[in-house]
């Protein structure tokens, strides 16, 4: 029996109805086979995310001027709950996708927003949120992944590793936080790393009891070059961006 939802707007109820329809037609018929396959062959439900993106369900909390739905979080979170009732791995992925795009919608320049957000919010590009490291989980100020500037090209050069990253190896872009100076928490910056960047690689998927379609791996940056235009916010603003995204 479906939960009775108290929604703040009529549009919110329409979104719940749409979500339930998609869950019944697209998610529930696929979940068991997909989870079973992903436990052994690292398959990933990319097309499911494209379906959700085409329906607008990957952009609910993002502003309308960027292609989002501009919905309050009490609507967005109830939509995620509905998805979780059908396929928990996909619900986790919806949350990851929203968080990966959040720095661009909130801290990006107008040019970055117009260039990056259409594919991010439509589901054409899947994102990963790369913050945690083996020695820097809750204390992100102790991260060691570093981005240095190549004076000749102006590019950032990334070296280091991120741990426990959902969508690693399947994402089209990696919202990455790295150290750009040794000034503690004030020395972090945020970069959008293309998924096909040279030097980007991934560890073996974590073995889990469930949520097999939520692929979790280490992300390795081996002299990965990132154009300076893909830095989000000011240099040194990474801590504020990361904490804001986690609060959102």
Give residue spans per PLM region.
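N-terminal glycine-rich flavin-associated loop
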Residues: 92-111, 137-140, 149
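A short core secondary-structure module
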Residues: 155-203
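Amphipathic, small/basic residue-rich leader segments at the start of a protein or domain
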Residues: 1-94, 115, 119-122
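Glycine-rich beta->alpha junctions and the first turn(s) of the following alpha-helix
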Residues: 3-15, 85, 202-248
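Glycine-rich phosphate/pyrophosphate-binding beta-alpha loops
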Residues: 85, 136, 163-169, 247-248
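Long, well-ordered alpha-helical segments
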Residues: 19-27, 108-115, 154-159, 190-200, ...
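Short Gly/Pro-enriched turn/cap motifs at secondary-structure boundaries
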Residues: 135-138, 164-167, 180-182, 208-215
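A short, Trp-centered hydrophobic/proline-enriched beta-strand micro-motif
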Residues: 123-131
């Amino acid at each position: 029996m479906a939960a009775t939802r108290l929604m703040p707007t009529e549009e919110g109820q329409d979104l719940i109805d749409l979500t339930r329809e998609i869950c019944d037609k697209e998610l529930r018929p696929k979940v068991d086979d997909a989870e079973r396959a992903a436990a052994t062959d690292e398959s990933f439900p990319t097309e499911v995310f494209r379906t959700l993106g085409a329906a607008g369900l990957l952009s609910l909390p993002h502003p309308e001027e960027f292609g989002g739905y501009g919905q309050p979080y009490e609507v967005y979170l109830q939509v995620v709950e509905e998805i979780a009732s059908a396929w928990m791995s996909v619900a986790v992925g919806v949350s990851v996708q929203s968080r990966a795009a959040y720095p661009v919608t909130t801290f990006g320049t107008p040019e970055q927003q117009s260039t990056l957000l259409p594919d991010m919010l439509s589901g054409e590009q899947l994102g990963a949120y790369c913050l945690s490291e083996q020695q820097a989980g809750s204390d992100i100020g102790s991260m060691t992944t570093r981005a240095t500037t190549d004076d000749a090209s102006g590019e950032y050069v990334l070296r280091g590793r991120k741990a426990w990253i959902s969508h690693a190896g399947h994402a089209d872009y990696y919202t990455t936080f790295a150290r750009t100076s040794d000034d503690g928490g004030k020395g972090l910056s945020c970069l959008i790393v293309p998924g096909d960047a040279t030097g980007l690689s991934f560890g073996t998927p974590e073995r889990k009891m469930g949520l097999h379609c939520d692929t979790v791996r280490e992300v390795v940056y081996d002299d990965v070059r990132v154009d300076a235009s893909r830095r989000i916010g000011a240099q040194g603003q990474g801590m504020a961006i990361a904490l804001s995204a986690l609060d959102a």
